[in-house]
């Protein structure tokens, strides 16, 4: 039986998601969540980073109380991150917690994470990726397997209107207004743009999403022909193929083999290693291990996560 993990921070977006799931708003569960039963098939997950001290603890208690009101189980995680912790690090801790909860409840059942990312979040992420010099994948973000984003077509203003109309309570995160974070500065910039500008970004996203699906489908076909799995469960591919392929194609192949766990610089490093590394040498990351012999590259994934 499929289980669903709802990421709920206590903010307006996630409280709307929780309410839509609980009330099956306009057939919401049937449309996005395979008709799952509430609350039996759901667990709420909340992570308190500890960044905002007492306020963070109050957010966690708020989420627990709301879950009691809805009659749904909740798992809370706690961190002790410094106030100066960056968004990327905080996100990693949060998703590591979601992964641990998913593994704890999975048994033999698939578990999907549902988040409250909305259209404004999507636009901000695309803009952020462009500013950081993204590759083509950064123009079609939010595409992880087993992560559902049912609110992605809805603007933030519509979610706020829903919350007010349905009398929902929520918590405000004051750090969302801080100019210290690049995402917040880009949010203010995007807010000043015309609807037509935003529509162009959405159209760019849709085109890139379609292209991404085509590329990944071709990768799957290539890998089915050229990659094997040995008795130890390691993925095996020929070093010769990586040497002969164009570099960007080889990088995409390695990204596929390593299940998206490595960053672009790490993939560049791995490609060089595959081309010139000596037999018997290894490279190890948190969830990826690679070993070379004379002709082959062996890749083992450990601590398999469903979220990246």
Predicted feature locations:
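AMP-forming adenylation/ATP pyrophosphatase catalytic core
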Residues: 1-13, 25, 43, 47, ...
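Core alpha/beta nucleotide-donor-binding catalytic domains of modification enzymes
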Residues: 1-189
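Hydrophobic residues within well-ordered, non-membrane alpha-helices that form the packing/core
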Residues: 21, 67, 102, 194, ...
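Residue-level recognition of alpha-helical structural elements
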Residues: 86, 197-200, 215
């Amino acid at each position: 039986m499929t289980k669903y993990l709802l990421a709920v921070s206590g903010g307006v977006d996630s409280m709307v998601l929780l309410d839509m799931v609980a009330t099956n708003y306009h057939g919401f569960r049937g449309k996005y969540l395979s008709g799952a039963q509430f609350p039996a098939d759901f667990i709420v997950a909340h992570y308190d980073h500890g960044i905002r001290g007492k306020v963070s603890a109050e957010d966690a208690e708020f989420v627990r109380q709301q879950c009691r009101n809805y009659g749904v189980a909740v798992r809370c995680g706690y961190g002790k991150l410094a106030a100066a912790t960056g968004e990327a690090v905080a996100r990693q801790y949060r998703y590591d917690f979601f992964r641990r909860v998913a593994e704890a409840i999975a048994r033999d059942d698939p578990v999907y994470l549902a988040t409250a990312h909305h259209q404004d979040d999507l636009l901000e992420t695309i803009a952020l990726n462009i500013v950081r010099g993204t590759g083509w994948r950064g123009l079609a973000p939010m595409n992880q397997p087993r992560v559902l984003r049912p609110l992605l077509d809805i603007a933030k203003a519509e979610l706020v209107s829903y919350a007010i109309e349905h009398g929902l309570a929520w918590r405000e995160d004051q750090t969302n207004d801080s100019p210290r974070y690049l995402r917040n500065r880009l949010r203010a910039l995007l807010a000043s743009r015309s609807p037509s500008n935003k529509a162009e970004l959405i159209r760019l996203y849709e085109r890139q999403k379609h292209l991404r699906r085509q590329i990944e489908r071709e990768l799957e076909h290539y890998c089915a022909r050229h990659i094997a799995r040995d008795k130890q469960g390691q993925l095996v591919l020929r070093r010769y193929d990586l040497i002969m392929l164009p570099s960007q194609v080889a990088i995409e192949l390695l990204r596929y083999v390593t299940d998206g766990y490595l960053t672009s610089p790490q993939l560049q490093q791995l490609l060089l290693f595959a081309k010139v590394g000596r037999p018997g040498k290894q490279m190890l990351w948190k969830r990826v291990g690679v070993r070379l012999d004379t002709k082959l590259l062996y890749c083992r994934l450990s601590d398999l996560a469903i979220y990246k």
